[in-house]
Amino acid sequence: MKHAYIVDAIRTPFGRYAGGLAAVRADDLGAIPIAALIERNPSVNWAQVDDVIYGCANQAGEDNRNVGRMSALLAGLPVEVPATTVNRLCGSSLDAIAMAARAIKAGEAHLIIAGGVESMSRAPYVMGKSEGAFGRTQKIEDTTMGWRFINPKLKAMYGVDTMPQTAENVAEQFGIQREDQDQFAYTSQQRTAAAQAKGYFAKEIVPVTIPQRKGEPVVIATDEHPRASTTLEGLAKLKGVVKPEGSVTAGNASGINDGAAAVLIASDEAVAQYQLKARAKIIASTTVGIEPRIMGFAPAPAIKKLLKQANLTLDQMDVIELNEAFAAQALACTRDLGLADDDARVNPNGGAIALGHPLGASGARLVTTALNQLEQSGGKYALCSMCIGVGQGIALIIERV
C-alpha cells in the first residue's frame, strides 16, 4: 500500500454570518485557499494535479454546478485539472480528504487538492415548481442549513428534527446538563481567545481582501466568530433555541459561518519529484450511520470503528479535533469514549462553538488545525471527527512525519 501525505494546508478566516466574508461568492471564496496552495508551492507542476475534490453542503446558489470545478478554475489551475464536489453535509471536506488519500494509496493519483467551501450568509431561498398549471402549492425554502423539501415518507420513518432539536435529543438521552454544556462552550471560547492572542491561527489562515466601492479594500485576516468576552454568567442567561427551558442555546452551539479550506495531498513519488515536505501521513478514515434524531452522537461509534480499523487506541491520540456542532453532542461523544470533559487533547485551541462551522469547509479546517497542533506540540497522532446531519459520523487519523 502506498502512502498519502499532507504537504500543505491552508484556510480562509471563518466569517460571521452576514459578516466580512458575506460579500464573497462561494466559488470565489473556495478559490482563495487553492490559489494560496499554488503560490506557496512553486515547485509543483500544477498541470499534473490529478484531481480537486471539494466539499460543499448547500449547492443551491452560487455554489451550484460543481463548485469544486468553479473554484479550481477561478484559482488559476489549468483547465486540464479535473475537479468534483462532494456532499456529505458537515463532513464533506473531511470526506474529500479521505477520498483523496484513498486514491493516492491505491496508486490512481499522485497529487490531489482536497478541501471545501461554504457561504452560509449567501445561501439562497429556493422555490420548487408547481406540479400543475396555475398551482399554488409551491414552497419557498431557506437553504442556509437543515431540512428542505422534506419527503413525507422519510418524515414518517425517522422524523425530521432540526439540528438544535437533535442536540436536545442527545442531551436528554445521554443526560448532558445545561451547566456542563455552558462550561464546555466557555472553555472553547477561552481556548480560542488564548490561541488568537498568541497568533496561533495566523500560520493556517490566508487573508481575504475585499474590494470596496469607495476607499481602500478591506482585509479579513482573523476569524470573526469568537467571542472572547463570553462568561458563564452570560451563557446561563440565554434561552433555549428549541424551547425556552431547553439546554441547547445559541451560546453552546456552533455558528452559521462562511469559509473555505484546502489541503495538498501527495504520494511518495510526488513528494520526491517536486521536492515537497511531507508533514503528515493520512493513516485511515471511516464513516458510520446512526438514527438521524441523534445525529450528533455519531462521532463516538465512528471513532471506535476507526481506532479498531487502524489498530490504534484513543490513548495514542495526541490531538483530538472533535467538531463542536453543539456542546451537548460533543460531551455525549467524549463521555462515551471515556474522556474527561476538559481533556486537554480535545480541541486544544477551541472548536466550532468559538471558531464557527461553515459546513462544507469545517472538516478541512479540523485537519489543518490538527496538523499545526501536532507540529507545535511534537505529537504523533491526531484524530479528527464530525457529526453529520441525517445521522452520520466521520473520522480520520493523521500521523506527523
UniProtKB/Swiss-Prot annotation:
Keywords: Acyltransferase, Aromatic hydrocarbons catabolism, Transferase. GO terms for molecular function: 3-oxoadipyl-CoA thiolase activity. InterPro entries: PcaF, Thiolase, Thiolase-like, Thiolase_acyl_enz_int_AS, Thiolase_AS, Thiolase_C, Thiolase_CS, Thiolase_N. The keyword Iron does not apply. It is an enzyme of class 2 (transferase). PROSITE patterns: THIOLASE_1 (PS00098), THIOLASE_2 (PS00737), THIOLASE_3 (PS00099). It comes from the Bacteria. Pathway: Aromatic compound metabolism; beta-ketoadipate pathway; acetyl-CoA and succinyl-CoA from 3-oxoadipate: step 2/2. One of its GO terms (biological process) is beta-ketoadipate pathway. The active site is at C90 (acyl-thioester intermediate), H357 (proton acceptor), C387 (proton acceptor). The keyword Oxidoreductase does not apply. Its EC number is 2.3.1.174. It catalyses: succinyl-CoA + acetyl-CoA = 3-oxoadipyl-CoA + CoA. Belongs to the thiolase-like superfamily. Thiolase family. Catalyzes thiolytic cleavage of beta-ketoadipyl-CoA to succinyl-CoA and acetyl-CoA. NCBIfam families: AcCoA-C-Actrans (TIGR01930), pcaF (TIGR02430), PRK09050.1 (NF006551). This is Beta-ketoadipyl-CoA thiolase.
